[in-house]
Amino acid sequence: MLIVEDEILPAMALRDELEDAGYHVMDLTDRHQEALAAARGRKPDLALVNIELQGHDDGIELARELKAMGVPVLFISGQVSRARSAQTVAIGSLPKPYSALDMVKAVDYLLRHQAGDESMAPPPGLEVFDETAPGLKPDPV
């Protein structure tokens, strides 16, 4: 798991909650280039990306680059309309404010969904965008 978030305290709380749930958070950053370097070093199963990052970095552009590397992205941003406008570069969005528990449920759902497990319903608040993104299988017809 890779967390790219400009607000350090919520990002640390999110990291702790995900790790308590059994996930490994490989890196926590607030910068575009640091996130890319981390993803190149060890490809994460999922990147949680805020749209507005430090130094005027753009999370949508980061998501585009991560997708090209085969890393699925979940937007974690209060900018719902911007997230929806960029749905081709992310697999979904969980808008702020969200609880750490909501995020764990969203991650559980997305990782199971990527593995083809359709037994879990998407948690409230999670908007799934492109079900044919890398690693995601389309729903059966």
What are these regions (language model features)?
Residues 5:
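Conserved acidic carboxylate
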Residues 113-141:
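CheY-like receiver
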Residues 99:
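Receiver (REC) domain switch/active-site region of two-component response regulators
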Residues 96:
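A Lys-centered signature of the CheY-like receiver
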